[in-house]
A protein has these predicted regions:
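Short, low-complexity, Lys/Arg-enriched N-terminal segments of secretory-pathway carbohydrate enzymes
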Residues: 1-3
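Alpha/beta-hydrolase superfamily serine-hydrolase fold, recognizing
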Residues: 8-15, 54-298
Length: 298
């Protein structure tokens, strides 16, 4: 059964001029994102024939609603006790077009590790603000754990990119500790309490980047406003995942960032684990910084 959490009852944005502005601005960016994904789709490698990709709708905790996901499965992998990796795409919490951008990452994991990879979707802001996205991610984890006849529940891992990494770490706090054995977080926004959180300027002081995207501060402000309602306490750990309770963090983890906007947010999570974690957590976590790379360099 889903673990109900107090923040789950928080209401949506109120319908007012501010919300109307958010919707219009976000939809404008969504249109640009769909165009960008269409024009650059040929640059992203397709999965090879040695991994099958299927589509699935799995049940959410909300009656009558389902969540979409792509499942990557190596050809020849036998049914029963299959290890599982769950991936959560980046989106700025608001852009649906980026679902599927991690397809080659998912393919490589499935191929090399001989595991099932579930690339899950989630609800987007501002129509579905905090905490609905992370609830969908936790529902995916719970759905996997409801199938012990199919999956090896002792080998379930999790990853996320950007906003998806934030949602992944938030979801860790909504499930029973130990359900996830390892986490990979790529440049997660982690501290909404910082005065710079909505501007995206907490970065390592690099100016030149080889690849990736340098997001403008006003775009960060928009995504933050769309995702976080005004009444939400920014210090709640399911939003500011830097403060995730240590007991909810797996013993193994990898935190990855380029030298752009999310560098400090990422390295501070790692530093906190090294400071407060158990001996197993301290030994099992790593930080990987990629010099001269911007946001979404991968």
């Amino acid at each position: 059964m889903p673990i109900r959490t107090p923040f789950e009852a928080r209401p949506l944005h109120g319908f007012n001029l501010r919300y109307l502005f958010l919707v219009i601005y976000v939809w404008f960016l969504r249109c640009l994102a769909y165009l960008e994904v269409y024009l650059t789709n040929h640059l992203r490698p397709l999965p090879g024939p040695d991994v099958t990709v299927s589509k699935v709708w799995f049940p959410s905790r909300d009656k009558g609603r389902k969540i979409f996901a792509n499942i990557y499965r190596p050809v020849g992998l036998k049914e029963g006790s299959m290890p599982v990796h769950i991936n959560v795409h980046g989106s700025g919490f608001a852009i649906p077009a980026f679902f599927g951008n991690s397809r080659y990452f998912c393919y490589v994991l499935a191929k090399l590790l001989q595991c099932v990879v579930i690339d899950t979707d989630y609800r987007k802001a501002p129509e579905n603000p905090f905490p609905r996205g992370s609830i969908d991610v936790s529902d995916c984890i719970l759905w996997v754990h409801s199938q012990p006849q199919r999956y090896d529940l002792s080998r379930v891992t999790l990853s996320g990119f950007s906003a998806g990494a934030n949602l992944a770490m938030s979801a860790l706090q909504q499930i029973t500790p130990g359900m996830i054995k390892a986490i990979i977080a790529f440049y997660p926004p982690s501290d909404a309490t910082s005065s710079y959180a909505c501007l995206g300027v907490r970065r390592f002081p690099h100016k030149m980047f080889r690849s990736g995207v340098q997001l403008a501060s006003n775009v960060f402000t928009l995504f933050n406003s769309a995702f976080v309602q005004r009444h939400v306490d920014p210090s709640v750990s399911t939003l500011s995942v830097l403060y995730t309770p240590i007991e909810n963090i797996p013993d193994y983890g990898l935190f990855v960032s380029g030298a752009a906007d999310m560098y400090m947010d990422t390295v501070e999570i790692y530093n906190r684990i090294q400071s407060l974690g158990t001996p197993a957590q301290k030994a099992g976590h790593r930080f990987l910084g990629i010099p001269n790379e911007a946001h979404a360099f991968d």
